[in-house]
Amino acid sequence: MLSTQNEKKTLLTKYSIVIPAHNEEDFIAITLNSLVKQTVLPHEVIVVNDHSTDKTQQIVEEFTAKYPFIKLRNILSKGEHQPGSKVIQAFLKGYEIIDPNYDIIVKLDADLDIPFNYFETILTHFNQDEDIAMVGGFAYIDKDGKWILENLTDKDHIRGAFKAYRKNCYEKIGGLRAHMGWDTVDELLCKYYGWKVVTDESLHIKHLKPTGASYNKSALYKQGAAYYALGYGFWITLIAGTKLALRKKKPTYILYYLKGFFEAKTNGTKKMVNRDQEKFIRNYRWSKMKQKIKG
């Protein structure tokens, strides 16, 4: 049905946040303080305290006592840090208890300092174009007293630390996958279904604990396994892995990535996408590479 001039578009205003947290006593208060100072407040904030042994729970409880929209859920999982699976398992535990009447679902890390107008700006983007599925800013890290861009990904990619999804898009892609590479496959599937992913360079988020600071060697293998699960194939894995290793200034990491890729292939690791999606992803990746070569 064609819309008439008298019809008004319903504005998206309700954004709900889930924050997985494990031993984040040094940062969680900064993150929550930045949320309660937003020009547009969250509809709901769920902090999932995942087996913390420090004062994370106590700090969050101080906020829940003061702000009714902040809630705490305590869960128990294995103590070691595993990129991807552990954090998304915690996120999904939080997602289970959110008010389903949200417009935008947000996954945040517990070590961020977010600018006061961040979510007002995010909502503006969503309301300007109904085809926008995801919006995010950029991570900045402290280096010698200066906040510089944490340049680990292309500028059209939203970091896993701060993902915001339109509700019907989140549901269409089947939610988040508890697997390393979840923060890449989500965007690729959005594009597969014809949605747009938007990054806003005016939004600078302070990332208080740089990415990968607490990963062990097995995480490097998991990165390679993630490339396989994304359906990249060997050549795209080689190129993407080399690029990531060089950005991390650890060129030997590519060897671990490739080992993880081949182990996943040999073991028959289940992919995160079906064959049609895999074909789309490979074509998309190759086309992006060709664009960069052409300049």
Predicted regions and their residues:
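Conserved nucleotide-sugar donor-binding
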Residues: 159-174
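Non-catalytic, C-terminal membrane-associated alpha-helical segments of glycosyltransferases
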Residues: 219-295
